[in-house]
Amino acid sequence: MPIVFEAVSHIYQPGTPFAWKALDDVSLTIPDGEFWGIIGPTGSGKSTLIQHMNGLLRPTTGRVLVDGLDLSDRKTDLRKVRQRVGLVFQYPEHQLFGETIFEDVAFGPRNMQLGAAEVERRVMTALERVGLDPAMKDRSPFGLSGGQARRVALAGVLAMEPRVLILDEPTAGLDPQGRREILDLVGGFARTGMTVVLVSHSMDDVAEYADRVLVMHRGRVHMLGTPWELFARRAELEAIGLGVPAAVALADKLRERGWSIPPDVVTMDEAVAAIRGVLAGRKGADRP
């Protein structure tokens, strides 16, 4: 189920002195089953872009196609689109409202007019997918830890059984362990064939999890490629206020000191493996 942008521009408050072009002639295609990371400076259009992917926003000009459905067409039933494309906002736990975890996660499936048995199946499955014990279903979501509450919010989206999952800074405010757990969950969804789009300010996260990385700047597509292709262009990223993953910075420092580090090192695991390889080579060279 590809998502296609065709020359999309979006203007907030058009026709007023406060008009602002948040997207400017964006064209791209997100293929089925890929994990995309979206990065860019504050105000670059990242959130506006993803809100076009399930019809929360419509283009001022251009077209957005999701599974062949034209989201620019006012006749398109956006409910069908939102059942296929799940969107998880920043701090989604702030949107929890059900008296119980079950009631919260069941909200979406019930709005799809599903039978009680199917709703229960989806809720139980979604809780298991986010690593929560289904036996928790009768607990209040408001007594959970931040990481658990975020999992409940994520389960509420997964219960709709979308084919595309879009996440806007899903680890914001979590401790390192909570961050890793959420990202590992999302990475697991991608490995099952789900299309995942992750908006993040963390270069390390997109380097580790994304198949492709989109860089937005001033509402336009600034760069697009694999993590190692993009982070090899460090000077261009720094020119627009972005950094590189810690592993890339470390690899650059080691190369300056004469270490033979491969050019495609972008994650810390890859950096460790490369360093071990160099050290093993030196140890072998020192043997009589």
Curated annotation (Swiss-Prot):
GO terms for molecular function: ATP binding; ATP hydrolysis activity; ATPase-coupled transmembrane transporter activity. InterPro entries: AAA+_ATPase, ABC_transporter-like_ATP-bd, ABC_transporter-like_CS, ABC_transpr_CbiO/EcfA_su, ECF_ABC_transporter_ATP-bd, EcfA2, P-loop_NTPase. SUPFAM superfamilies: P-loop containing nucleoside triphosphate hydrolases. The keyword rRNA-binding does not apply. Keywords: ATP-binding, Cell membrane, Membrane, Nucleotide-binding, Translocase, Transport. ATP binds at G40, P41, T42, G43, S44, G45, K46, S47. It is a peripheral membrane protein. It holds the Pfam family ABC_tran. It is found in: Cell membrane. The keyword ATP-binding applies. Its EC number is 7.-.-.-. GO terms for cellular component: ATP-binding cassette (ABC) transporter complex. It comes from the Bacteria. NCBIfam families: ECF_ATPase_2 (TIGR04521). ATP-binding (A) component of a common energy-coupling factor (ECF) ABC-transporter complex. Unlike classic ABC transporters this ECF transporter provides the energy necessary to transport a number of different substrates. Belongs to the ABC transporter superfamily. Energy-coupling factor EcfA family. Forms a stable energy-coupling factor (ECF) transporter complex composed of 2 membrane-embedded substrate-binding proteins (S component), 2 ATP-binding proteins (A component) and 2 transmembrane proteins (T component). This is Energy-coupling factor transporter ATP-binding protein EcfA2. It comes from Symbiobacterium thermophilum (strain DSM 24528 / JCM 14929 / IAM 14863 / T).
